[in-house]
């Protein structure tokens, strides 16, 4: 399994370099099969943006979120590759379901 594409769907930057929110879509599939993949989405939010926008009375428990101090797209790719590595199974469907524990899998 590999990342076949990583697309930014939404980008928001504040006044500071450490104030941001991104929405991503990632295509993950077997390296040896062209075109075969599953689509997942996730959000990336800075600690500063989360602290500012998050309700003082709320609790957040959700998959499909990455929280980062600074924006680094290469680090994001490495994190997704790590998720894929942890999720690999001989059965691709099981691998896809394992990845879905971390990222939101789009419905077919």
Give a label for each model feature:
Residues 1-92:
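Short helix/strand-capping turn motifs
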Residues 85-108:
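C-terminal charged interaction modules
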